[in-house]
Amino acid sequence: TVPWEKVRNDIAVVIPVPKDRRSLFVVPWVPKGDGTYRYTYIGTTDTDYKGPVDDPQCTKDDIEYVLNALNASVTTNVTTDDVLGVWSGLRPLVKPDENAKSGRTADLSRRHKVLTSPTGVVTVTGGKLTTYREMAEDAVDEAQKILGTKKKCRTRSLSLRGATGKRWSSTDVDVHLDGRYGSDAAALKSLIAGDPSLADELVDGLPYLRCEAVYAVTHEMAGTLDDVLTRRTRSRLFDRRATRAAAPAVCDLIAPLLGWSEAEKAAQLAHFVDECAREDAAGLVTEAEFIAASK
C-alpha cells in the first residue's frame, strides 16, 4: 500500500511485469470526497514459500519486486520509503502433472478441484480467492450428492450481506457506516444510540469508529486484537504507529466482550506490538511520515 499521490490512478489497472510473464494489479483504495483516493495498493507476487504456513511474511524481496514492476509503468518513482503497509498470504495450488513444462508456481492452473475420499470426506483444493463462491458451490453440491438429496447450493442468486440498494446518509458517521456495512449499518448505529462514545474515532486520524471494534467481535467473529485492527478494519495497514498507540484502548474496549483476563490482554498487546515492530524493521513508513516528508 502506498499513498495514492505517488501513482494517481483513478481506476484499477493491470500492468505487465518486465521479463516475468506476469501481471500486477494497481488499485485505488478509499475514495475521498474530491474524487481522488487515499491509497493505492499493488500486487501480487507469486513466489515459492517454505516458512511457517500460519504466519507468512512479506519480504523485502517481495516489496522490491512489486515496486520495480510498478516503476517500469509509471512516471513517478515509488520507493520502499513510500510503502505504508503490506500484507501476505498463501494459496494452496493443485499439485502439477509430472509432465508439466514449467515448475514455476506462477504457471500452475488456478482452477480448483473437488475430491471425495472413500469415507465420504469432501475436500476442495486449489482455486483462488476471487472464485471462492463457485468453489463453495461445487463442494456443497458434491456433499449433497453423497447425502442423496436433491438440494443445491443457493448462493448464486443471493445478495452479499448488507447489500440492499442505495441508502441516503445525512451525517459523516452515516456516510462512513453505510458505505462500509450497507443495511447492516443499522446495528452499528444502534450501538451508538446506546453509547454515544462508540461514535468516537477508533484510531487517531483514521475513519474507523469505536463501534466498529465492538461490531467486529459481536458480529464478525473477531477473536484477537490483531483481527480487529488489521483484518476487520485496516487500521494497521493505513497508519501502523497511530494504531499501535491506540491498541491499549482498543484492547480495553473489546476485552470484556471476549472474556479476556489481564494476562490475556497483556499477551494480545504484546503480540500486536511485535507485529508492528516487524514492519518497522522492514523500513515501512506511516502515512503521516510520508506527508511530512513531502512538504
Sequence positions of predicted segments:
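C-terminal accessory subdomains/tails of enzymes that are appended
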Residues: 1-10, 16-20, 29-40, 44-295
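Conserved active-site segment immediately N-terminal to the catalytic lysine
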Residues: 25
